[in-house]
Structure formats: structure tokens, C-alpha cells
Amino acid sequence: MKLLLLALFLSISASCLAEDITKISESRIPNEDAVPDYEAKWRLGAIQKLWNERRKMGHTPMTKFSPPGFPNADIFFKNETATATRTLKHRFAWALLLWAITEGKVTSKTSAVYDSTSGNTGSAEAYMCTLVNVPYYAVVADNLEKEKVKQIESFGGKIIKVPVALRNAKAKEFADKNHGFYMNQFGNAEKAEEFHESGDFYFESTNVYHEIIVQLKKDKEQIVKIPDYFVHSAGTGGTISSVGRYVARYGAPTKVVLSDSQYSLFYDYVIGHKFTNQSGAGIWTPPGIAGIGYGYDIEPVWYGETTSLTRNVIHEAMKMPDIASVATMRILDEKGYNVGPSTSLNFLVSLYKAYQNKARKSAIKHRLTIVTLACDPGDFYRSTYLNNEWVEKSFKKFGGVMGMECWKKLIQESIDTGSDFYSKGLTMCPGAFKV
């Protein structure tokens, strides 16, 4: 009897809760707006502003570096510091906000956009949100460089400081609490980043590899029109994945190489599919290389949630000692390249690819062409990576300034003569490299 009553109750409950289809009748023709007029008007206006920004962005310039020690190799920097916010994240934030508005994640009623950032995405998101009149809050580490804080604020962003490991969780918490939208650049980059060719279409693709191909094609002095290697690090993983997807989709003969920092988990995530069930707690060693790598987060590497790095479109991955990247930053600074530590890491991996191709007598017969990105300016790091006191304290385990100078000498020697800086550095320079 009890079971019969329970079944009757559940049946009645289900019928009460069941949704009914909208019916066509002589008194009603179903025809309503899915999006209110005022919202459609706001969305159209916001998207038009973003496309106007894309046109102003144009193509960031490319600069060729030809190391004397590798006479058959060219390393191109695509200079993303030429954007309005001076970083690679300008085009990325543009893509993120365009995605969020297009999908209705950000609307005219959104109280604010919140995101976790190490600085560069924050300044670019602040710029883009200000462009469409949506308030923006950057949730940053409590020890973020003062130069980056100033940069975010200069574009209209507000700063919320938290412990670095809590940035993602706190950004989501603040967004939920204040009826805002958590952009989650790490999880949503793969949804937002463009990876299609656009030809001469009026609304041109923002894919950085697309621009590279267009620029090399137009350069009459450039014989090699398609790069042999594209080298880049990963923060969200969005940029390098968008390039990898583009290369795979169109069958381009370019190898996509992930450059990773010393204690980052990305190398092992890509090569061995590790750390999908384990965080980097106890592995990550600060300061690392600003803006890139994975390890300080309290969560494992979860695709679509904590990262957008698409491992299946990466051809190679390579790690470099952090102190060597710092040394490279000093070399590039002295040569007039105003670039940050992630750019220096990219260059270092590019230089080693040139060495490998020379040492292995590669089958590549034409002039080896490597393209990497100049991600942000060295100006942001005058108080850190370009400051000897900070280097001495932060990289004490690797010899501090003395260790940096050791690597600097070997890397400069490689640029000049084509020698192997990596093997020499691991044996000759201070640090815990001996097994």
C-alpha cells in the first residue's frame, strides 16, 4: 500500500513539474524575441567596438635576428609589445571578451568581469572591458610587480590581491558573490582563441600564426614563406594551442614547440600526460618565469578548467633552466630588445633548435626559419628580473648573479660561434643540475 501511494505521489509530482510545449492556436501564433531589443543593440555596439579595435591592432611587426654562429638560421620575433597594452595578451583579451559577449556570458546587465591574472592578461582585459563600458577586476598575487599593477589600473581595472595559489578560486568567488562574470582565461582560452584562416576577409582572423604567414608572404626579401618552427611558452596555453590547431587544420609544415620553465608541469603534461590528478604543490619553485608555466595552482592540470593547452597539437616540448632565461633576458636587453623573461625563454629554445639542426646536420636544406613571440616588455621587470639584488636573492640556489653571468657568457658564445650552451651550462654553471 505504501509503495502504491509513493508511486501515485511521484506520478502526480512529475505531472505537476512536467514542462509543456508551446502550442499553435488560432488565438496565438508563437513568435517572440529570444534576445530583447535593448540587449541586441548593446551587443551589436560592443562587438563593433571590438572589431574597430582589431583594425587598429593591425599586424604586429616582425624583427629578424640572425645569430652569427648559425649562418643558415633566422629567428623572427613577432613583436606583440607593439599593441596598445604592450603585450601578447592584447589580442587574447580581445578574443576572450568577443567570445563572452557573443555567447551572452557578458551582457549589458553584467555587474563586472573578474579574472585571475599574473598581470598581462589583466591589463589587456581591463582595456577591452573599459572599451565596452563593463567594470573589470583583476585578481592578482599579493606580490605582483608594481609595474604590472600600475599597468592594469592605467586601463581602468581594479585590483584585488590574494595569495597566488588562491587566485582562480577567489576570482570565481568574487564573481559569484557580486553577480559578475568570471572570465577564467585558463579554462576558456580554447573556446575564444581563433584558429581559422580568413584570407582577405574584412574581419581578419586574429590568429597569430595566420598573421605570420601573411607577413612572410608579403616580404619580398624573405625566401622561406612558412616557418620550420614556431616556438612559444604557455600561460593559459591558448596561444600556442591556437597555432597548433591552425597548423594541424591546414597541414602546414611547421613544428610547434612548447618552451617551458624549469619547475612548470606543462612539459610533463604534454609529453607524458602527467599531473592530471595531482597538483604542483611541493614541486613548483618560485619565482619561475613570470606569466607562464603551471605549478603554483592548487588544482591539477585540467583541460577546459585550469588550462587550455591542447597537448595533441604540440609537436615538441623543451625545458630550460630559469636562471638561463634570466641570463638571456640580460643579453637581449643589451642588444636593444626590450623584452621580458618569457620572451627570453622562447628565444633560448629557438637558439637551441638552431644548434640541434646544425649539430644533427638536419635534412632542412633551405634557410632554417624559426618564429617566436615577443610577449611583453622588459620595462615591466626592472624591479625583478633586471635587478641584480632580486636575482641574487631569488636564484640563490643557482648561484644568483654569478650563476646568471655564467649562463650569459655561454649563451653569448653560442650566438657568436654556434656552440652548445645547454650542455656546457649544466656542467659548468652553479646549480642543482647534477644527478
UniProtKB/Swiss-Prot annotation:
Keywords: Glycoprotein, Pyridoxal phosphate, Signal. Transmembrane segments: none annotated. GO terms for cellular component: cytoplasm. One of its GO terms (biological process) is cysteine biosynthetic process. The keyword Glycoprotein applies. Pyridoxal 5'-phosphate binds at G235, T236, G237, G238, T239, S342. SUPFAM superfamilies: Tryptophan synthase beta subunit-like PLP-dependent enzymes (SSF53686). It comes from the Eukaryota. This is Putative pyridoxal-phosphate dependent protein F13B12.4. It comes from Caenorhabditis elegans.
